[in-house]
Amino acid sequence: MALRTLVSRRTLATGLGFRQQLRGLQTFSLPDLPYNYGALEPAISGDIMQLHHQNHHQTYVTNYNKALEQLHDAISKGDAPTVAKLHSAIKFNGGGHINHSIFWKNLAPVREGGGEPPKGSLGWAIDTNFGSLEALVQKMNAEGAALQGSGWVWLALDKELKKLVVETTANQDPLVTKGPTLVPLLGIDVWEHAYYLQYKNVRPDYLKNIWKVINWKYASEVYEKESP
């Protein structure tokens, strides 16, 4: 019940690494990174990447699995108050797992194409919807810097409107909470844990430098697959 209010079963399953069945309940595991922790330096330090992946993302996975198991037990017992109480934990930790699983794919070392501008249909779509790649970067940087507290800034494909849009989400809310037709192409984590060890409290510097390791190839692949 609570899961359906977060995202569809299909959305949850996509790219998140199921690992086993636990009493009929599917659980999740921490995905491996497709590069070494230090591979994104100097844009993002190896220390940040290791802490971000091994500690923060792992905590979301652990707490998500725990909340899902508690939900499973509560439903089996007909414990409606506990079911309702678990909704926020499932949304927060499940969203954290979804968002970070996308985030790691949105990054790539420079030697593997990180930072190279998007080409093909995504490049054309960016020019059409925002005027230029530079204008898109400025818009996402501005909205990410202005986001109060913690959250994410996204480049998304709106499949209903058939256009690219920039959205922000608070805390660990996944993009789907902003609309069921939004497909995340690129998400940038603006929680302090994503940059504080290196950039202190200067979020704009982090936002400026992360574009040097953005994996536009992955974003283009998602766009090609999902574009109507």
From Swiss-Prot:
Q: Which cofactor does it need?
A: Mn(2+)
Q: Which family does it belong to?
A: Belongs to the iron/manganese superoxide dismutase family.
Instruction: Choose one Gene Ontology CC annotation of this protein and give it.
Output: mitochondrial matrix
Q: PANTHER family annotated for this entry?
A: SUPEROXIDE DISMUTASE, SUPEROXIDE DISMUTASE 2
Instruction: Enumerate the residues binding Mn(2+).
Output: H52, H100, D189, H193
- What range is the organelle transit peptide? 1-24
Location in the cell reads: Mitochondrion matrix
This chain's source organism reads: Prunus persica (Peach)
**Reactions catalysed:** 2 superoxide + 2 H(+) = H2O2 + O2
Q: Which domain of life is it from?
A: Eukaryota
Among the Pfam families in the record, one is Sod_Fe_C
Q: How is the cofactor bound?
A: Binds 1 Mn(2+) ion per subunit.
| GO biological process annotation, one example | removal of superoxide radicals
| Tissue spec | Expressed most abundantly in parts of the plant which exhibit a high metabolic activity. Expressed in pre-shooting flower buds, vegetative buds, immature fruits and fully expanded leaves of basal shoots and seedlings.
Q: What is its EC number?
A: 1.15.1.1
Assembly, per entry:
Homotetramer.
Main location per the UniProt record? mitochondrion
Name of this chain's protein: Superoxide dismutase [Mn], mitochondrial
Provide any one GO MF term from the record: metal ion binding
Keyword annotations: Manganese, Metal-binding, Mitochondrion, Oxidoreductase, Transit peptide
Q: What does this protein do?
A: Destroys superoxide anion radicals which are normally produced within the cells and which are toxic to biological systems.
The EC category is oxidoreductase
